[in-house]
Amino acid sequence: MTTPAIELRDVYKEYKSVRTVDLKHLTVRKGEIYGFLGPNGAGKSTTMKMILSLVKPTSGSIYVMGKPISRRSYLSQIGSMIEEPSYYPNLTAYENLHVFQQMLGFNKEHIWPTLERVGLADLKNKNKLVRDYSLGMKQRLALAFALVKKPTILLLDEPTNGLDPAGIHEIRELILSLAHSEGLTVFISSHILSEIEHVADRVGIIHKGHLVYEGEVDAIKSNTWVEIGGRFICEKVVTQLRTIEVYPRDISTRRIVLDSLSDDNIAAVVKTLVNAQADIYAVERKTETLEDIFLNLTKEM
């Protein structure tokens, strides 16, 4: 069995006797992009901080590349972007990373290639002071800080927070490109469901500190069905559809729900219903979305 890049076992965190995180088991596989979703205050940032040893869990075990995080050497394998990074506003991107390099001791030769990878090494930007950066450029610089150590794992907490749609698209494409070209494992948190749906291989949803869902993004997208709106006599419709070996998932006097069908089979269903004197006003293919799952699991009762 392949060793996970990140594994949490029976991890919980209490603040003032309130359990804010309670994760029985969470694994991030090597080389995947794992989307960590949840409402504000669900425990996403606390979980990431525990993985980075910035917050100590009340109980439980955390492993990175199969080793317990009590061995601090594991941190050299992780690049992180947690909350808003601190910069020296009167320095350039290179100078900021050089200060970082002097603190941590990684190879100075990594700095320019890293800035090139995040799009901050061109003539227009190389001499620009960070105080003059747009928010999107600052997010790129934050990614550079995470990447410059040449990590194998990236932890990104809300990396598109505060960006406009164009900026979100830019950062999303950059993360995808870096993950695939470098073979990185990426653990990314967000409350923007559509962005996670675009980048992640697998998602976990945390709600009130508990992991309430985990699944493959492709499996979510493959859950499709057909809905037919109209006026139906249920018993008559069921009998008629049985003659063409179609069995509804659900049926009412106003709606029929069927498993996913080919175009030809949908045409046959419609023809059969019309012959049964049903009035039809809508036929629609439906696909389950991450938003459907998220809202269903996190809605307040």
Where in the sequence are the language-model features?
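Conserved ABC transporter NBD signature motif
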Residues: G60-Y74
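Conserved catalytic motifs of ABC-family nucleotide-binding domains
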Residues: K150
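ABC transporter nucleotide-binding domain
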Residues: R172-L258
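Conserved ABC ATPase "signature" region
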Residues: H98, Q102, E109-N125
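Catalytic Walker B motif of ABC-type/P-loop ATPase nucleotide-binding domains
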Residues: L154-E158
